[in-house]
Amino acid sequence: MSKAPPEPFAVHLPSGDRLLLRAFGDEFASRLETVDGYAAIYDDASKSYVYATLEDGAYVSTGVSVAAPAPEGLAKHLREAPLIRQHRFTSRYGELRPAETDGLETFGHNAGLLTGRQRSHGAVRGLTILVEFDDVRAGMSTDDLEPLMNADDYRRHGNFGSVRNYFQVMSAGKLDYTNSVVGPVRLSRDKAYYDQHLLVEEAIQCAIDEFNLDLEDFATQLPGEPRKIVDAINILYAGESWYTRTGNGNLWPHNHRFVKRFGDVETGLYMLTGAGNSAAGLRIGTICHENGHLLCRFPDIYDYGNRDQDDRESEGIGYYCLMGAGNHLGYRAVPAPICAYLRRLAGWTTDVVLEPGQSYQLRHGDYGIAYLHATDRPSEYFLVENRSAVGFDRYLPDHGLAVLHCDTLGSNEWQDGTQWRHYQCALLQADGKKELEGNLNRGAAGDLYRDRTGVFLSGDTTPNSRAWNGSRSGLILRDCSTPGETMTVAVGPETAPQPEYQEAYPFEPIPDDAEQGLEVTMEFPAGTSAQRIQVWVEIVHTWREDLQLHLRAPNGSSVVLRRRHGGSGDDIRETYDSEDHATLGKLTADDGGGTWTLWVRDLAARDVGQLEAWAMQLG
């Protein structure tokens, strides 16, 4: 699956005009707009692109070419009704993802990954076929394509490495993915024909016939499987990728399963994308994205907009991962790294558990390490990584420390951020704006953390580090450095927790000469430290030596704060502190959460009074 590119693409009209359009969506459901925002569709009758309007919630042709001015009164940014979009998505998804094959979805049913066999470790050999059409010739040769797929230190045409190099770096050397490149093979029809008819079978057969291929060279027999299956087939066709038809174009970059037996070998997963008009147009981004599905069984971590009982669009992780929209960065020549969440699921990382009170130096590009904070749920955790403007991160929309909130049971359709509906991998956007969830952009300045002093992420900040069920995960980050090759961050609170203070004004009379006395209470939240206890009491009374004060803790333990001393005097205005009141010190505890009770007794007759106020501070 491949999300639409951010930049406009060119289409050629029957008149000979060349026009720019924008695409939104992916190969399952997409829509087109002119660069000034009018909805456009391909009109089969005129074999051209026309302005679209809505009829019963669906796009219909206005009959006016997009090369002409827009019809008067036509609104911009028209969208089909949700039910229409859902129907288009379901129909196309059924074509590309038949039920009897392994899922290729945003839901990672296999502990976060897609079902089906993984080829994410060791040496893997793929087959790459360069394809041209009867009317469109390839603008490059296999001599141009082979280094794009396999070379060390590949830097041609703005690319920051080859496909092989990309996966070597991301896997910390655990995956060595090479490709045999053949072609070009010329197909029998014009390019437009294959937008409606899948070219895969013809391309594979042509490659076998013309280059005497033995598919067994690219196949693996895994334990428990009776047959050999080709690991990966990459088909790159002549010209730019076509993002043309609304939801039904077979030339939209995609991956799928094509199953056919060739002798003792069976084909399996393939990917398909445009190669560009010349060697200068060769880019690794989309090839790496689709091979993330083929080899590693990575799900897309962007929002299809039409899955899992959700028809609202969002951006998921945006540009911050190859499997979001990150394959488009650097004009698809410098794709974003695979995020720590997916690298960890692939088995490419070793966990470094973030310990409170420790400081960490996070080196950029140390892709074999995952800095982890676990929660009480095994499927849910936080990951922290250095995403400074270095290497494959150079074109990110922001740079700094990224914090990912991960749950293998989430869905990348669910932008709600609630206990039951949340992303599989959510970027905690440092500015708290949640623009990715709001479908406002694919990433922007302010998304990542940098140059922070003191606590910048906890259960009480915005954004916060609470688990999806609202409980505190315990993750506290502070003192984040400037972005660079190495970033430092400390874990745990900067100082001891702030004391919890409460006060009350009962103005309650104290029963005279009565054993039961007066009881008043205060409630402190669970987890409140009671290493130090301070109590303030104010009582108006005509003979204070009649009074005795007790304090009872939530666990039932009780101490006497003030005994009857004899003598005379009015009123009590006193402070009791566990640091210099040995008896009160017996109630100190790590957790003082619960109900505290002040018990006031007047143990002699005649003189009376009342409890005006009292206060407690726990810390």
Tell me the role of every PLM-derived stretch.
Residues 99-102, 107-120, 158-265:
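Active-site-proximal segments of metallohydrolase catalytic domains
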Residues 495-619:
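Loop and turn regions of beta-sandwich accessory domains that flank beta-strands and are enriched
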Residues 128, 235, 296, 323, ...:
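Residue-level detector of buried hydrophobic side-chain packing
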Residues 1-115:
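N-terminal prosegments of processed precursors
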